[in-house]
């Protein structure tokens, strides 16, 4: 099944890609019937893949792994100055192959297929820089919170340190346990009824966000995106987090700001 979509972002810059230019082919890899090699027809356009399995990738070629049997919709979006166009194809994976879940990011984030299959993460509140901010774009100093870095327990009582974030491998499920409140940037307080000023920003009543999902975008700077309604740490209006460092028990993230101009930083640890 092939589905197409087109978006013309700026007609003054020319036409968006054609249907033919947005097409792609796939083939079964030599390593596993559950691993597909994807190739965009247009090698010179910016290409964004959604494998339909909770993973995204960029580039004219990509490799998609499907540990679980089922039908998946692969989506390719190609971009030029005139806009974008998307096409999709459905693929059927006949058998489950759990060995494909040995992705190191999956394993560190969730415990992996041979472990518990989920991990609970919390803010590493006793570490300097567990929350911080710097410029966007980054300065020559790089990925550091050069403008401000929280000291140990700086935000105690703000509704941040008792939050829990549970990443589950099966179905890429994500649960956000708030214990009744969250900590949000002052510019977003109006979106949270009942919020009140606290330690420079706002604490807001907010219930648990259960049965959400998380999505990994792989590459040189892998990112995690959580689904609407959920988020990680101090809320700045974005849902995508760049992984700066990830071990079996610690995680450092960088993320943006809804109005631009800022990069926020977060340190977490396993519970």
Segments (PLM) and residue ranges:
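Extracellular/lumenal mature domains of secreted and surface-exposed proteins
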Residues: 5-120, 125-127, 242-247, 262-264
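Short, solvent-exposed loop/hinge segments that bridge or flank secondary-structure elements
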Residues: 123-171, 176, 262-264
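Contiguous, well-ordered beta-strand patches that form the walls/edges
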Residues: 151-246
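Short helix-loop boundary/capping segments
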Residues: 185-188, 254, 269-271
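Short, low-complexity, Pro/Ser/Thr/Gly-rich segments in the mature regions of secreted, periplasmic
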Residues: 261-271
């Amino acid at each position: 099944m092939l589905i197409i979509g087109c978006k013309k972002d700026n007609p003054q810059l020319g036409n968006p890609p054609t249907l033919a230019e947005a097409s792609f082919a796939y083939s079964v890899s030599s390593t596993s019937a559950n691993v597909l090699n994807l190739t965009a027809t247009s090698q010179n356009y910016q290409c964004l893949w959604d494998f339909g399995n909770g993973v995204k990738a960029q580039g004219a070629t990509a490799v998609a792994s499907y540990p679980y049997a089922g039908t998946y919709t692969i989506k390719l979006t190609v971009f030029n100055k005139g806009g974008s166009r998307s096409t999709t194809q459905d693929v059927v994976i006949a058998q489950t192959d759990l060995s494909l879940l040995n992705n190191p990011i999956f394993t560190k984030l969730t415990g992996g297929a041979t472990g518990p299959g989920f991990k609970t993460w919390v803010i590493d509140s006793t570490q300097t820089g567990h929350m911080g901010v710097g410029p966007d774009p980054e300065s020559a100093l790089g990925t550091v919170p050069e403008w401000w870095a929280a000291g140990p327990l700086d935000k105690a009582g703000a509704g941040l340190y008792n939050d829990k974030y549970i990443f589950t491998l099966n179905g890429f499920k994500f649960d956000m346990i708030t214990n009744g409140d969250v900590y949000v940037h002052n510019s977003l307080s109006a979106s949270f009824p009942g919020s009140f000023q606290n330690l420079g920003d706002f604490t807001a009543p907010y219930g648990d966000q259960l049965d959400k999902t998380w999505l990994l975008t792989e590459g040189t700077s892998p990112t995690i995106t959580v689904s609407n309604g959920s988020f990680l740490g101090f809320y700045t209006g974005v849902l995508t987090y760049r992984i700066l460092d990830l071990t079996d028990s610690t995680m450092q993230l960088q993320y943006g700001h809804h109005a631009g101009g800022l990069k926020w930083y977060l340190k977490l640890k396993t519970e």
